Amino acid sequence: MQALYDLPAPAKLNLFLHIIGRRADGYHLIESVFMLIDWCDTLHFECRADGAISRQDLGAPLPAADLSIRAAHALRAATGCRQGAHIGLLKRLPAQAGIGGGSSDAATTLLALNRLWGLGLSLSALEKIGVTLGADVPFFVRGRNARVAGIGEIITPLAHGQLPPACFAVVKPAAGLETKAIFSSPLLKRASGSATISGFAAADFGRDGDCYQDADFCRNDLQPVAQALCPEVTQAIEWLRARGLQGRMTGSGSAVFAQIPQAPDLGHVGDLGAAPEGWQVRVCENLMLHPLAGWAADED
């Protein structure tokens, strides 16, 4: 095998995000449910005989050491592999949005090069490499909607069908937010009550209508801080509210999202009306599995 083309790197939404504490090393402990959506970057991979790692930006220019490049080098360092790769990356997912675009690129790179280079690493082995790149990477490697805890490395997949199919409006304001600025803010409360997986399983996520608005599982503890630092987060929520949609922030922002009722007149971006200049609005569906699910074995 010499090449793999058109591999997706999907975004995620945080249905809720609770900060329950902080480790001695400064990392925050979270509880959240991550849900995959069908808004994706696209990556291409070709073997290089000279052993070099390179990247071609097929869209907007990216930093020289973006997460796809870092993932390729981390995989080689962990395995001793000397093979090379050329990565083509078509970037659609906005940065500083809280939807995991860079982490998803890293996960797709790990899964793809594990196959392209014939390494045969398991999911758990790839997750251990992934967490060194970013807290969200193991989730994308695992490739299933999941409850996520710890600093992001404790992943409990949800039962198949627990999250019903739904449609979401995702709004990314022009302004972005640095994750570090959110977590270092003195405004951040770090003592949320713990949310159990059994409690989430009992929540109302299976009825018709706006089934993703259970009161106990739609809070993002980072949102008040983000709104204080970035007024456009509030503006985006108000933009959704003006259209009858209940918005909330995903991740560390600045993107917000809302479920769209299953109605024929609210299924396309154009139906939501014009957004302010520089904003991105995307109508997405949730995914039950990552498109590359099954690309690595579950066990060593």
UniProtKB/Swiss-Prot annotation:
Keywords linked to the UniProt accession: ATP-binding, Isoprene biosynthesis, Kinase, Nucleotide-binding, Transferase
Top-level taxon in the UniProt lineage: Bacteria
Highest classification ranks of the organism: Bacteria, Pseudomonadati, Pseudomonadota, Betaproteobacteria, Burkholderiales
Keyword Aminoacyl-tRNA synthetase: no
Entry keyword annotation includes Transmembrane: no
The protein's name in its UniProt record: 4-diphosphocytidyl-2-C-methyl-D-erythritol kinase
Binding positions (ATP): 94-104
Entries under Pfam families matching the protein: GHMP_kinases_C, GHMP_kinases_N
Entry EC no(s): 2.7.1.148
NCBIfam families associated with the record: ispE
PANTHER family noted in UniProt: 4-DIPHOSPHOCYTIDYL-2-C-METHYL-D-ERYTHRITOL KINASE, CHLOROPLASTIC
Catalytic activity: 4-CDP-2-C-methyl-D-erythritol + ATP = 4-CDP-2-C-methyl-D-erythritol 2-phosphate + ADP + H(+)
Pathway: Isoprenoid biosynthesis; isopentenyl diphosphate biosynthesis via DXP pathway; isopentenyl diphosphate from 1-deoxy-D-xylulose 5-phosphate: step 3/6
Active site: 12, 136
Organism: Verminephrobacter eiseniae (strain EF01-2)
Role according to the record: Catalyzes the phosphorylation of the position 2 hydroxy group of 4-diphosphocytidyl-2C-methyl-D-erythritol.
Top EC class of this enzyme: transferase
